[in-house]
Amino acid sequence: MLASRLPDVITLGCRLNLAESETIRSLAGSRDMVVINGCGVTNEAVRQTRVAVRRARRDRPNAEIVVTGCASEMDRNAFAAMPEVDRIIPNAAKLLPATWGGFPNHQPPRRHARAFVGVQNGCDHACTFCAIPQGRGASRSEPIGAVVTRIAALVEDGTNEVVLTGVDLTSYAGGLGALVEAILIGVPGLPRLRLSSLDTIEIDGRLFDLVTGEPRVLPHLHLSLQAGDDLILKRMKRRHLRQDAVTMIERLKAKRDIAIGADLIAGFPTESEAAFANTLALLDDCDIVHAHVFPFSPRAGTPAARMPQLRPEIVKERAARLRAAAAARKTAWLKTLLGSTQQIVVEKPGDRGHAPNFAEVHLPSIHPELVEPPSFSSPSERKGIASTGSARMGDTSSAPTVGSVITTTITAATDDHLMGTIA
């Protein structure tokens, strides 16, 4: 059940949405409101946004239900027709104070394991399967100075990990490498900087050197690969070929042990079994250990929706095979981390976190009810709280707080996560 009489922001979709939801939360004031920040990347994401709207109305019958994000941007009429929806806010207006009436936010600051910072929005490319440019518009970037100032304030308030987000992050104006370098120089107290989804074809020399040589840039990259077959990549209107991705990842991993994640689409129109096999083989050829697999979803208005479609059962079956192969690779990779020492940022409820390589680590001897983060009423109360922890099991007075960085020793591996003890 959602809390009553306070704004609640429900987020679906990408990390940029997560970053934007925090801004919305700070602008929404203290009204009886539920904001659904929806996703339109697939038909299923749009369906889930509608489900969230209906659930919000059921749980908060007297609240104002506000919908924003790509789902309502791309299908405004359908959301406007929903009786549960009171207001729709365009993406272009959702971060403007005037949109929310200029109400001050009286909610206590929320503690997060990491801060998502949106630095780029929109996309100038035309991938045939993607409807996101319809919802986000042309590419635009936040000024470097504004980004550095924002991150410096987060670190001052105790943030230990910042994740840079964007629709097409590597198209950041002036170069993503220049931005990363400015952050590292301008915010020397930032311990961990993580990059969200990157396009391999846009990783230039400056960014390559920072990713492979700067310890504060975490050794985990999520890449927008989509497919492993050249003909399918061309029909997707991607800007790279299979070998481009393989070569870039080989170069990266030759310099540093970087965990590779990737977005992959199964069942794209005209995909043959041989073409799918090339995508399946990409898991091994690119050493992918964090895979996001999507069954192809035809989005209205995109060129791919007009191409010859595969039967739904074939799309579903190929996505299942790709997910199973990806899961097996991840399990094998996790086993290689047994006995290692990993620094994790503690996440809610307080008994888990993610290592620099984005492996999830659970601490089975920590009791979550003992490690809930405190509420803060001022920045001075927040300062220093998220510093590296040194808690011992059973010592509740020094249990790690959400957002703190602790050192763990990995003692076991399951199919999808690690288990450890505090070192």
Describe the residue ranges of each PLM region.
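Cofactor-cradling patches in redox/metallo enzymes
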Residues: 1-96
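Conserved SAM/AdoMet-binding glycine-rich loop
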Residues: 65-69, 74-75, 156-274
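Flexible, low-complexity linker/hinge segments
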Residues: 101-112
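Canonical Radical SAM [4Fe-4S] cluster-binding loop centered on the CxxxCxxC motif
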Residues: 112-145
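Conserved alpha-helical substructure of the radical SAM core
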Residues: 136-163
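Conserved, mostly hydrophobic/aromatic
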Residues: 147, 164, 195, 223, ...
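A structural motif corresponding to the C-terminal lobe/cap of the Radical SAM core domain
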Residues: 219, 234-347, 351
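Terminal RNA-binding accessory module
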Residues: 298, 305-370, 385-389, 397-423
